[in-house]
Amino acid sequence: MDKFLIKMPIKHKNNETPEQKPIVKKETPKAAAKQSNKNTPIQAKEKENAQNDTPKQGRAGRSAKPAAKRKNLDTLEVNTEKNTAESENPPKRRSGRLTRSTRSMAEEGTPSPEKVKPEKLPFIKYRGAIKYFTENQDIAASADDVMQWVDKQTDVDVVPMAFDMEWPFSFQTGPGKSSVIQICVDEKCCYVYQLTNLKKLPAALVALINHPKVRLHGVNIKADFRKLQRDFPEVSADALIEKCVDLGVWCNEICETGGRWSLERLANFIAKKAMDKSKKVRMSKWHVIPLDENQLMYAAIDVYIGQVIYRDLEQREKQKLINELQFKEQNGEAAFKAVKGLGETFLSKINEITL
């Protein structure tokens, strides 16, 4: 009977009403935390209300685990601060969507090399002749000489000619009138014609760029022709566009790359050379006579490297056609289409395969 008398208060301890608060003895922090977990829901709620009413309560007061509903209210401010910090410094996540680069790989097979960070390459050095003319009669005589040289190339049907233009630019007034035309038909000689003193282009120069045997090429060359036609109406942009070659587009066709190219990136990718594209020279006063040495070298290098790139792409195209033909003869049309579908460019010879 004594045993039951001793254990009865312990049995009723959990069934106490809020008014029957037991005398709390000093306990260790660990025991106190354990005891707080054994409180009834009503006691826990009253304890939370008491904690919320205490103005000087710190972070320690929120260390105990409250009821689920009350927890959302108590931690609202903390979550708000956390969300604000995350919005200012969002964590890096892996997106399930296709990025631009992965999309190009999925849809086009090979990402554009122009977007790949180029390695350190040697700068282009041009050691050929630069023939510079500023007057109408001198430009006409020079263009006529080039045209006669083209006519003498009887062993070829097409004579490639690198073509580029320069003009001044102002952030206040925009682009100025076409000031310089530079051409290159031989890697050993470049021609620079300054148009500042010309009201019309010489007939010999117009005849040269429209010569049926001449194939003008460059990067974004169609825009240059439209600009030239606006400044000199005697030039027909449509006629020039029909027979010109955009080196960037041609590179994509042969090398099966994608994207838009600049001359500098094409030089990196095809010729393995770097170009010194000085902004000071590029944005200089191209209409002022005479051009200085830096301007002349800048203009000459643009068409010189264009001619080098054209010759390189020309050789790649020929080799590609040979490799494709040999592969078809050895493996058949079905194998060729299968390998082509896997992304093979045939820029280099591949051995016989078994499917």
From Swiss-Prot:
Its EC number is 3.1.11.-. GO terms for cellular component: nucleus. Pfam families: DNA_pol_A_exo1. One of its GO terms (biological process) is negative regulation of mitotic recombination. Residues 1-119 are annotated as: Disordered. One of its GO terms (molecular function) is nucleic acid binding. The modification Phosphoserine is found at S104, S112. Its main location: nucleus. The keyword Metal-binding applies. Keywords: Exonuclease, Hydrolase, Magnesium, Metal-binding, Nuclease, Nucleus, Phosphoprotein. It is found in: Nucleus. Mg(2+) 2 binds at D164. It is an enzyme of class 3 (hydrolase). Residues 13-29, 71-91 have a biased composition (Basic and acidic residues). Has exonuclease activity on both single-stranded and duplex templates bearing overhangs, but not blunt ended duplex DNA, and cleaves in a 3'-5' direction. Essential for the formation of DNA replication focal centers. Has an important role in maintaining genome stability. PANTHER family: 3'-5' EXONUCLEASE, 3-5 EXONUCLEASE. This is 3'-5' exonuclease. The gene is WRNexo.
